[in-house]
């Protein structure tokens, strides 16, 4: 379903985007880092529709459990220059209740 959603997202952007210069790309909401490499590549292809200013910020929200070397390389290759890594809690009991793994810092 995700690839079909991305196809519809591309259709929507193409129908509404008028070519304005963009200074911020924010990929977030629903933890996009949980997408597969194939899905992320498709998303980055869609984002290339936008015309970016010379200086821009490109952010992607990440769940620490979803980050791997391949995804970090993909982010870098697609000019993501900021990661937003959310923290649900530093309390072990809260993490257990939320069914999240514990991150030792």
Show where each model-derived region lies.
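Conserved non-cysteine loop/helix-boundary elements of the Radical SAM core domain that shape
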Residues: 1-105
